[in-house]
Structures are given as structure tokens and as C-alpha cells.
Amino acid sequence: MKPIKKRFVPLVLCLPVAAALLSAPPVHAAHGAVVRVTLTSVWATPSPDPMGITYDPRTKRLLISDSEVDEMPGLWKGRNLFVVRRKGNLASSRTLKKFTVEPEDLAMDNRHRSLYVTDDDLDRVFKDKAGKDGLFGTRDDVAVTVLHTRRFGSFDPEGLTWLPQKKMLIVSDSTTRRIYKIRRGRDRKFGTRDDVIGSFGTYRYGFTTAEDVVATRFTHHLLIVSSRQRFILETTMKGALVRKIDLTGLGVKAASGITFAPGTDGSKSRLYLTDSGVDNNINPGENDGRLFELKIVP
């Protein structure tokens, strides 16, 4: 995660805008309820700042990335990819460091057994192809760059999701608070001149950061999380507001990643949310990462 730059604006202009933007969720909002909380900080190989998250349906495991652990000498064991059971137990810890030590987010392409990975230091999206072992984060992985996000104005790409039906990558930029939708052109390759790119902003809905994004399976609505706001923003693919899902009172400190996966309570689908807690730039010794399993209550 890139350090936050301080900006000073006249207070007389800032207060009315902030009041309007950061007000409570509207009447049509839903709220989240906790199903389970896991302390990623107490794993045998800890994840102090879990950031990215996706679900691997083939192994029925969550994959979680930590982009900050390499900055903590006391905790860094060369592992920044964590394979996790849905109940929160660590199955194994692996590494993506041969192509990134800053894996901000993950998105699964199960059909092609590939993992998309964002890096907000290099401003790239990588595609990591599993080798013969079928596993991610092992020696036989083959990783290539598929997007240089600066090409379309994203200098802080943090969130990522893959829509197989639309063959679309969606990137959330934490600094611009914009959601970028990228589709391949006629050459059927990402990162070339004929890519079709669209975007919309989230600041108008009260977000001051946009950490991650995931798409619903049937409606293709987008769920977006912020490390500073205590709600999940749901929009249409074009950016129209659907609702805000209130997270107040759940104990989430800094939402960093979001994905769907089967619930531990028998539900076909629950939200899994990573919480990076206190920023290691503020407290270099922090180790307070958590994983939330949530249900949405209308």
C-alpha cells in the first residue's frame, strides 16, 4: 500500500461537503452481520495486513495476499500468499515474491487455472498461471504482466475482480476512488491499444478510498469496500448506486478485500472480508489482521 499523502483544503469548504458525502447510509440500505471472525495474526505464519482475497472453487479454499508483511522483519518469512479454509484455519503459506512483494489483491480465473494479481508499487496487473502441480505460489508458476494500469490513469491499483462471462477485469484505484473496467479488443489480449476501458467514481457516494471490488454472480452488481468508510458500496456495472451495506458496530477497522464464497453455516454464498487493521506505517510492529465472514441482512 502506498503511503497516504496529506492534502490541505480550506475548512469552510470541506465541512459541508464531508457532511453530505459521509452521512449515514440511506433508507434502502442493508446491514452486515458477523458469521465468523478469524485472527490472521495468530496463524503459524502470520498475516498482519491481509489485503487481497479470492476463492478457489477447485480446492474450496480462500486465497489471501498480504502486501505489507515484507516490511515487517519480525514477521516476514518469505510468504505473502495464504491458503485458508473457510472456517479460518491456515492450510498453507506460499509466495508470489518471484514477481511481486506487493500483492494488493487477487482474482481467480478458474477455467484457465490462473490468478490475476495487482501490484500498486509497480502499477501492474499480473497473470499467474499455475504449473503442473495445479497450485498457486509454488516454483512452477508462470507469471506475466497483462496490464500497466498507468495507461488508463490508475496509479494506485489495489482492488481486482475477474468477470468470466464478460471477459472483463475490474480494477479499483484507492487514490482516485475510481473503478476501471477493462475488456480485451479484437486482438483478444489485455494491455494493448484496442482494449475497451470505462470507469466511474465512488467519491460521490462517500468513499475516500476504494480498496477492493467484487461482482455479484447473477446481477453483476459491484460491491466495493473502503478502508476508511464503514459500509460496503453496491453499484450497477455503470456506477449507479444500488445500496449501502452498513458495517457499523461489526468491529471492522480497515476493510481491505472482499469476495464471495460458500458459507460455513451451510449458505451457498457469504461475503468474506479482510481487515488490515492498523497501518504498519503508523505502527511498524502491528499484527492485527482479521478475516470476517458476513451475511447481508436486508
Give residue ranges: language-model regions.
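Bacterial N-terminal signal peptides
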Residues: V12-A20
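Bacterial N-terminal signal peptides that target proteins for export
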Residues: K2-L13
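Compositionally biased, low-complexity segments enriched in small residues
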Residues: M1-K2, R36
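Sequence/structural signature of beta-propeller domains
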Residues: H28-P298
